[in-house]
Structures are given as C-alpha cells and as structure tokens.
UniProtKB/Swiss-Prot annotation:
InterPro entries named among the record's database cross-references: KH_dom, KH_dom-like_a/b, KH_dom_type_2, KH_sf_prok-type, Ribosomal_S3_C_sf, Ribosomal_uS3_bac-typ, Ribosomal_uS3_C, Ribosomal_uS3_CS
Source taxon at top rank: Bacteria
Family: Belongs to the universal ribosomal protein uS3 family.
Region (Disordered): 215-253
Lineage: Bacteria, Pseudomonadati, Pseudomonadota, Alphaproteobacteria, Caulobacterales
GO MF annotation terms: mRNA binding; rRNA binding; structural constituent of ribosome
Assembly and interaction partners: Part of the 30S ribosomal subunit. Forms a tight complex with proteins S10 and S14.
Any GO BP annotation: translation
Pfam family, one: KH_2
Name of the protein described by the UniProt record: Small ribosomal subunit protein uS3
Task performed by this protein: Binds the lower part of the 30S subunit head. Binds mRNA in the 70S ribosome, positioning it for translation.
Originating species: Phenylobacterium zucineum (strain HLK1)
Domain KH type-2: 39-107
GO cellular component terms listed in the entry, alphabetical order: cytosolic small ribosomal subunit
Length: 253
C-alpha cells in the first residue's frame, strides 16, 4: 500500500497535519474548500519564480492567515515590501475576510521534494538530459542531509515514440513505515513532445513519537523568518554510505 498511495495523505495525523486548517459546516465547507483551491492555484502561478513549496491556510474568525514557504522570499516581498502588499490585496479580493500573509524562507531548497520536482521539470523543459537532471538533484539532496531520495519521471523521455517510466534511488526511502518522515512532491514538465510527470520522495529520518505537528516543528528549525513568520528543519546525514539504485540494475551497496 505504501508503494502506491500518496505518502503525505498516508501520514496525516501521525507525523504531519493538514495544509488547510479550519472547520466549517454544510455548504460553507464546500465554498471555503473551493476558495482554498483557487487561492493556492493563483499563488503558485503568480509566484512561480519564488520557488513556493507549501501554502498553509488558516481561518480564524472572519480572517484568513496564509503562510507561504518559499526558497526565494525576496521575490515575493519586493523592494520595501511593496510587492507583498499588492499580493495581499489581490488575495483579499478572492476571499471574504481580512487576509494576513506570512512568508517563510526555505533555507535548504535542495532537500525539499516539491522544489526538487519543479527544478527537474524546468530542466526537462530546457531539454536537459533527464538522467543528468535526476542524478544532480539526488546528489545535492544527499549532500545536504537527506537520508534517502527517490525520483520517478514518466512520459516520452528524450522524445521517444513510446512513453515509459524511469526511476533512481539513493539511500533509504521506507514508504511502508508510518513513522518515517517522507516528503513528497509532484509536478509536470510541458515539453514539445508532451507532458512528463516528475515525482520525488525525500526521506528525512523517523519521528518516534506520535505528533501531527512534527513536520511544522522540524521546519521551524530549518527555515528562517522572511516576512512576518518563522520557519522549520530536517534530518541529519545518513549513518551508512549512500546507496544508488536504478530500475533494472542491482544496487552498488
């Protein structure tokens, strides 16, 4: 089961919590859910150059508090905070209540699964060889403290007539272990040959206690304040040497 299911959904309530943190009844729930989806899509599209990894939406009474985790917060904030104020007004136009924006810097974007996936997708769109892009991203993540990385790419790789899937893995990525802190990211590269899907799993270590806020606590040590907020951190170097695998090839370990 752990091999197929989204690792984020599998671990909700165990070592991480939801990105939308509010409660509503009846038709109000559906309206707020669609509003969250609309806000996230608009922010991801508008802040594409900022390297946005995660958007958390909280809704205290008649307010909307949005926390954006980004690799380049300066792109969002702008000179003397001019851009973030304009962004806040645009987001407020999409919601009913008062909007507060909190920008948090990701200090190690090389170990963030979503940012790794988006970086590989950008390279594929620039016609970089997919194997080279995958290996570079894996090596950077392992060098900066990830305990294991797995990357899947699928589609018309290299412009081939028949679509296929290839994957690489380095270190450990225990998808069945619920206490494992596994970060997951997915995006699509739109190439001239068609769409190529990119999936990334990053293993950061194990969370031994039952703590749904473990991810937020870890990120607090890793990221630094970049707007009105703080940030968070991940695991250390693996005890064993890295192990690299490719589908169809034996391990080098």
């Amino acid at each position: 089961m752990g091999q197929k299911i989204n690792p984020v959904g599998l671990r909700l309530g165990i070592n991480r919590t939801w990105d939308s943190r509010w409660f509503a009844d009846g038709p109000e729930y559906g309206r707020l859910l669609h509003e969250d989806i609309k806000v996230r899509r608009a922010l991801k599209k508008r802040l594409y150059q900022a390297g946005v990894s995660r958007i958390i939406i909280e809704r205290p009474h008649k307010k909307c508090r949005i926390t954006i985790y980004a690799a380049r917060p300066g792109v969002i904030i702008g000179k003397k905070g001019a851009d973030i104020e304009k962004l806040r007004k645009d987001v407020a136009a999409m919601t009913d209540g008062e909007v507060h924006l909190n920008i948090v810097e990701i200090r190690k974007p090389e170990t963030d699964a979503q940012l790794i996936a988006e970086n590989i997708a950008q390279q594929l769109e620039r016609r970089v060889a997919f194997r080279r892009a995958m290996k570079r991203s894996m090596q950077s993540a392992m060098r900066l403290g990830a305990k294991g990385v797995r990357i899947n790419v699928s589609g018309r790789l290299g412009g081939a007539e028949i679509a296929r899937m290839e994957w690489y893995r380095e270190g450990r990525v225990p998808l069945h272990t619920l206490r494992a802190d596994v970060d997951y990211g997915f995006t699509e590269a739109k190439t001239t040959y068609g769409v190529i899907g990119v999936k990334v799993w990053v293993f950061k270590g194990e969370v031994l206690e039952h703590d749904p806020m473990a991810l937020d606590k870890r990120l607090a040590g890793e990221s630094g304040p970049a707007g009105e907020g703080g940030g968070r951190e991940r695991g250390d170097r693996p005890d064993r040497g890295p192990r690299r695998e490719r589908r169809g090839e034996p391990s080098n370990a």
